[in-house]
Amino acid sequence: MLIADIGGTNARFALADTDAAGFSKEQTLQCADFPSVEAAIQHYLDDIGAKGPDVICLAAAGPVVGNHIKVTNNHWVLTVDDLSDAFATDAVRLMNDFEAIAYSIPVLGDGDCLPVGFPEPKPLPEGDYSVGVVGPG
């Protein structure tokens, strides 16, 4: 599975295994060096010697509208259809970068967190709960 974090300046790509935690072959590319996300992905795949991915999951800075994201402070427009066509896969997921951060919260360990301010942090409850993510943007 190809995963990416796409911002206004950088696109960070990696490969992930759907059966294991973590990722490999991480690489950061400058968005301005490529005319499209598809061109950047192809460069990344060529550079690491990988074939086209079966699954693509991209998190980007910008709102998801229908099946596309216009990346904030970047000339790229990500669309499910263009990515599906370019890499011959129907398994394409686009999400906002803060949505991706929220999905990571349940798997964070104690060493992944740094308390800021007061009160002292409490462990997350088991089960379903609401998550809020605060940051710039």
Question: What annotation goes with each model-predicted range?
Answer:
Residues M1-D5, V55-C57, R93, S130-G135:
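Short glycine-aspartate micro-motif
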Residues T18-S24, D46-K51, L124-E126:
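Short, glycine- and charge-enriched coil/turn segments that flank and shape catalytic ligand pockets
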